[in-house]
């Protein structure tokens, strides 16, 4: 609901009518109240509602919607859904289907980026999945290595391996987790960069050949391979490194014929080197920090591009001003290993004031349901 509320805010400012979709669990959700219209799409479990593309398309047709903004999560990076929107004559506010497909596989994405001259972490990104072969690749790369699910994300399907003796068990475990989480046990093996920083570049491209970057976000503060704090600009980033990473991200976007908002994620090593990790083909959770330091409404640019217009900005227009830090607020129980903690919100005071932004999908009195991600707000 948080991202739906965010999108509705820009649509309201631009005079665009909005239609919310909601499950049984979200019947009283904030985004349902904010939208001009709301359509019920099914039971609480996501597989029976928010992941059912045909039901969402039916809701769009019934309400007369011209476009669908997928937000993040659920169907936001689903090429099949983007294709179905196109076939139904409804604009998918996101990149072309081919770009989603190209970036959907980490192995295929790395091959494409390598061909475009974007720096890659030393490793094996090919199709041979024989355990003995992968072990030999790891031995040649040198430990520690990282085994990663090719179709992975959200911290699932990743194992750090520090010695040859531990490789076989880690590989088997990683493949099992990947198969269960993504239905695909294909993995890649890469050098594990010690003391790395997770730095990502926000890019935008239109359908007229224009590509710009909106500088970087540092997302190194994580737990369980998931981001907790994000900030822009990255502390200690030199102008030379910023320019090099920005240029590499723009090349990455051009290499896949990108259009819309995208994020190119890099691993940055202490020695100044940086390596392509993946490209997220959607609006990121942490996009507000970029908006705070550039003054650019990312959702508004998405809507411009989706309607066939050119970007409203050139690279020379993008200027960094100040510093922003975002903290994700999750409904979790710290006394129970930070497990998700559903329940009713009895009191909520939203912080406000100069240079303070609070993005939320909840209000006092609402119940946090157990069916979806535990993140409820961002400060």
State each model region's role.
Residues 158, 230, 328, 375-379:
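Short, hydrophobic beta-strand segments
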Residues 120-122, 261-262, 300, 309-316, ...:
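Acidic/polar loop patches that form or flank catalytic/metal-binding clefts of enzymes
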Residues 316-373:
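Glycine-rich active-site loop/lid that clamps phosphate-bearing ligands
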Residues 244, 296-303, 308, 323:
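Polar, glycine-rich mid-to-C-terminal structural blocks
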Residues 34, 153, 261, 320-322, ...:
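Short, solvent-exposed loop/turn segments at the edges of secondary structure
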Residues 1-264, 268-287:
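N-terminal beta-alpha lobe that positions the nucleotide/phosphoryl donor
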Residues 247, 277, 296, 300, ...:
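Feature representing long, continuous alpha-helical segments
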Residues 284-297, 301:
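ATP-dependent carboxylate-activation loops
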